[in-house]
Each structure stands twice: as structure tokens, then as C-alpha cells.
Amino acid sequence: MESYARGQTTIMYEREGDGPPILLLAPGGMRSANNFWNNMPWNPREKLQDQFELIGMDQRNAGISTAPITKNDNWDVYKEDQISLLDHLEVEKCHLVGMCIGGPFIANLLKTYPERFKSAVMLQPVGIDQNRQAFYDMFDDWAKEKINEQSGPTTETMTKFKHNMWDGDFLLTATEQEISRIRTPLLILMGNDLYHPQSTSRKIADLAPNATLLEKWKSSDFLEGANTAVIDFLNQHT
């Protein structure tokens, strides 16, 4: 992997393939790292690199990326890492492909920097629907590791950070009204479990004016069709 430093933050990233650029925003919750794609039923690192240049990153304090943790950290510090990496690589405009926590990452980028993105694919985006405690528990599990590191953050800092990240509603980084104003073409591959509620995917598809919902994709019977749908969608908007 290559590294990009911005202040005290070091982001590790990989570039694979050749073609129009795509920023990959990996699953894994607070542990979102590029190698998490390798365990997913649909892996863009396998399926897309013949036609696209893939920019895959480890988010701050995930994988081998590092950054200070403060009580003011929130979704926006991740957003600025992501857009700064694109600036560093001189990528003026690209596609987005994100799974799980990648859904809120994508929404935050699209509502703030719509001119930078041609299209976006959200795979089973996380969202809030009577499941907030599950996200608190997921965060706390990750936070224990960070607190135990040498010179790690305090419990108080991590508690504030947790609430900054997971106290929102719906898609966490965007309200229903904000999603309704996103004009960027969206393809949503529906979630259907505790962390990735079906209701979140459906609501995004209902609200965003240029969104398409693909309901069935994860099982072996549907994966090839889903792969074709993603590639066709990206090519259509390249």
C-alpha cells in the first residue's frame, strides 16, 4: 500500500486496475479497510479492475491508517480524509462504490461535493431502524482496542466520539430532505439484516430522484446479474 499524510493523519491506500477512477469505501464499520472487500460476496477488487482504476483506502484508525482521536471527531473527519486523498491523487471526478459504512460515507460526500462524483453504488448501507444499540456495541468493541493502545484516547473521548457517529437517524450523515436533493445517479444493492436494514435501502431509493434499487444480489443465484448491473451502471455514467 501507499501512504498519504495530512497533518498527523496517515491514510494508506491502493490503486488497482486501469480506466475511469472509482473511490472504494470498504465495509467493516469502524474497521473499514480495503482488504475487507476480499471477504464480501461481491468484491469490486475482483470484478471491476479490468475496466476501472480502483482507489481503495483504509479509513483513519482502521487497517494500517492512523490518526489522532478527539472528542470532536465525527463523520466529517472521514469525509475530509476521503476528499483530500482524491485531491492528493489529482482525481477531479470519479465514481463511488461503498458497502456498509460506505453508505453514509457516500451520502456525506455527495451532499457536500456533488460536482466531484459521476455516480455512486451503495451496497447494503447501514442505517438506523430500531438497531442503534448494535452500533454502540460495535463501536465499543473497536474502542476498547484503541483505548488499550499506548497513548490511546480516554474512555470519555471515545464515548463522545461514539455519540457523534451513531446518534443520528436514517442514514446518519444525511436527512431525508438532503437525500431528496442528491441528483447524482445512485445504484443501491439492498441490505436485509440488523446493521443494514432493508428500510434504509428502500428509503434512499424512494427519496433520491436518480436512484435505482436492486433487491436481490447477495446469493449465488443473483451475483452474476448484480455484477452486470453494477458494471452497466458505472459505464452508463462514465
How should each PLM-predicted stretch be described?
Residues 104-112, 117-145:
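Flexible "cap/lid" loop of the alpha/beta hydrolase fold
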Residues 150-175, 192-193:
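Hydrophobic, aromatic-rich cap/lid helix
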Residues 7-66:
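Conserved HGGG/HGGXW glycine-rich cap/lid loop of the alpha/beta-hydrolase fold
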Residues 94, 98-100:
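Conserved alpha/beta-hydrolase "nucleophile elbow" surrounding the catalytic nucleophile
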Residues 77-94:
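Conserved acidic catalytic loop of the alpha/beta-hydrolase fold
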Residues 211-238:
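Catalytic active-site module of serine/aspartate enzymes centered on a nucleophile-bearing elbow/loop
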Residues 182, 188-190:
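Short beta-strand/loop motif that positions the catalytic acidic residue
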Residues 194-200:
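Conserved alpha/beta-hydrolase "acid-adjacent" motif
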